[in-house]
């Protein structure tokens, strides 16, 4: 039975859904949507929990995605949701509040006051950016301040650019941004934390270094002006865009609460099949420390979905094998039929 994409009915307090789903996907970014599409096309019953806008929602366009280069993130998500319509995928706008493993091995996920049960759980909850506490920076995140030159560098190529940060990550990002423009300034905000070798690297390719504390960011696309970086005790700097590599944290506490192991960078640890340290629980996308590109997240979602579908196929075969060897009272072997199909 093919079901259109639909929201769940209003919950009744404390109700446990009787149906056992194949998969619950927590998170509807590119990774979760891609997994839902592949599982839906594999005739699996899926519940996709949305839970909010994608991390790239503030930017005006997503780039680097074949046939969709320059598409607005909201339009990209709307199209992905529409693509799920022919399949048995139910989309809920609410996120998961709680997850637990049941005594029978199934996973229970609380949405509002309702619990939904599934054989497999897939997290695609992403990460949250922790932005520096520079006045004016947060308001311009995605609108004059960016994290990925591969996503937003071309639109500013050849113009005056700045990289905010210090240490190894800023050194790497400044050298990368230099490929788009020969007018790059590194903003160390009072703490350069650069080794002499890193400083030589930057100066060798013409990256200027400003060590003064940054006071404020003004202007930018929000005001149809260049970004004006003001400093304490030094002249301001006008640039077309600022790039930075922010610290990040998990987008949801649920994987860790369920016992999924995190690596030393705080990312959910997965194997080559996207499975976490908890059997039957998978994780995909930015939350695993994979390269943070839309196409990479979508590919990981598709890969995990194929692994999950294969696992479910094998589990059904093994279940039928065990049923076949059950004997009735007369001692004759009998093969139990598979569960009836919804179609």
What residue ranges belong to the model's regions?
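Beta1-alpha1 glycine-rich phosphate/pyrophosphate-binding loop at the start
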Residues: 15, 21-78, 159-160, 165, ...
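Residue-level detector of alpha-helix initiation sites
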Residues: 29-30, 129, 168-169, 288-289
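FAD-site-proximal beta/loop scaffold in flavoenzymes
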Residues: 133, 139-155, 246-295, 303-306, ...
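A conserved FAD-binding loop/helix module that cradles the flavin
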Residues: 36-37, 171-174, 284-338
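A Rossmann-like FAD-binding core segment of flavoenzymes
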Residues: 3-8, 78, 84-110, 116-118, ...
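FAD-binding core/adjacent interface of flavoenzyme oxidoreductases
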Residues: 2-23, 91-159, 268-272, 276
């Amino acid at each position: 039975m093919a079901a259109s994409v639909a929201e769940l009915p209003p919950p009744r307090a404390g109700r446990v859904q009787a149906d056992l789903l194949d998969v619950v996907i927590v998170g509807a970014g590119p990774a979760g949507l891609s997994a839902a599409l592949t599982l839906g096309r594999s005739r699996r019953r899926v519940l996709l929990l949305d839970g909010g806008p994608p991390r790239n929602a503030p930017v005006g366009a997503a780039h680097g995605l074949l046939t969709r280069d320059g598409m607005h993130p909201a339009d990209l998500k709307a199209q992905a949701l529409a693509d799920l319509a022919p399949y048995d995928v139910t989309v809920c706008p609410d996120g998961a509040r709680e997850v637990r493993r049941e005594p029978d091995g199934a996973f229970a996920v609380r949405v509002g006051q309702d619990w939904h049960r599934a054989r497999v759980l897939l997290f695609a909850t992403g990460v949250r950016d922790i932005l520096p506490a520079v006045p004016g920076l947060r308001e311009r995140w995605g609108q004059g301040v960016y994290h990925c030159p591969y996503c937003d560098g071309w639109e500013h190529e050849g113009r005056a650019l700045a990289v905010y940060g210090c240490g190894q990550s800023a050194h790497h990002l400044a050298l990368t941004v230099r490929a788009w423009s020969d007018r790059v300034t590194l903003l160390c905000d009072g703490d350069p934390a650069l080794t002499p070798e890193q400083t030589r690297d930057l100066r060798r390719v013409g990256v200027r270094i400003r060590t003064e504390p940054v006071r404020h960011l003004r202007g930018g696309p929000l005001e149809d002006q260049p970004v004006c970086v003001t400093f304490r005790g030094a002249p301001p700097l006008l640039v077309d865009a600022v790039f930075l590599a922010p610290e990040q944290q998990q987008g949801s506490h649920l994987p860790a609460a369920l016992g999924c192991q995190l690596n030393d960078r705080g990312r959910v640890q997965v194997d080559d099949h996207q499975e976490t340290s908890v059997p039957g629980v998978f994780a995909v996308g930015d939350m695993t420390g994979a390269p943070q590109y839309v196409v990479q997240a979508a590919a990981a979602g598709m890969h995990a979905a194929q692994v999950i579908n294969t696992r479910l196929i094998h589990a059904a075969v093994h279940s039928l094998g065990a049923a076949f060897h059950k004997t009735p009272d007369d001692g004759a072997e009998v093969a139990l039929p598979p569960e009836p199909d919804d179609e």
